[in-house]
């Protein structure tokens, strides 16, 4: 599903990624562990080209996505990414956050996107928060909404960048439970 070959990433003279090779099969779960500043987030951001690698190749679903001709926005539709600080739009309701991308990218009409969002909210026990704004949610709720927002695009793979690091210890379990369910269902 994802193949990384001789991946390098530098910021000026600082080489953060030094020749990474990795092969991730469909349904496989990979955890990248290392100290702060070791390049974990940079690696994840390179996988969907939020960061442009200095050199090397990344293949996703049989396509070389580091090829300049690749429509990376099209590729990203199949890669969900959840960040450590939620990145929800504060001016939109929970429902608006979840349905924005599927509607804007014309993957679903508004009615379909709303139905899909409500189904996903049911799944994580937060349907009652559909009309709430992010400022009204706990950290754990915000992160579960961020996961659902990515799932609303029906991705083939989910990338999680320290999804529990910004949470209070008592909120971590809520988010990990959603991640365990995804793993059990075979999400890569």
Task: List where the protein language model places each region.
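ABC family nucleotide-binding domain
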Residues: 1-188
């Amino acid at each position: 599903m994802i193949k990384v070959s001789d991946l390098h990433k530098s910021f000026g003279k600082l080489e953060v990624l030094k020749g990474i090779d990795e092969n991730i099969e469909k349904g496989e779960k990979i955890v990248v562990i290392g100290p702060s500043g070791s390049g974990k987030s940079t690696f994840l951001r390179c996988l969907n080209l939020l960061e442009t690698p200095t050199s090397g190749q990344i293949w996703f679903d049989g396509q070389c996505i580091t090829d300049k001709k690749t429509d990376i926005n099209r590729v990203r539709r199949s890669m969900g990414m959840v960040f450590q600080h939620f990145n929800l739009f504060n001016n939109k309701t929970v429902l608006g956050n979840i349905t924005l991308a599927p509607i804007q990218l014309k993957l679903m009409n508004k009615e379909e996107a709303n139905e899909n969002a409500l189904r996903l909210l049911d799944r994580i026990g937060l349907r009652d928060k559909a009309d709430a704004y992010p400022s009204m949610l706990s950290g754990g709720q915000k992160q579960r909404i961020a996961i659902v927002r990515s799932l609303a695009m029906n991705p083939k793979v989910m990338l999680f960048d320290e999804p529990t690091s910004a949470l209070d210890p008592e909120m971590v379990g809520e988010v990990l439970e959603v991640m365990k369910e995804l793993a059990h269902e075979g999400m890569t």
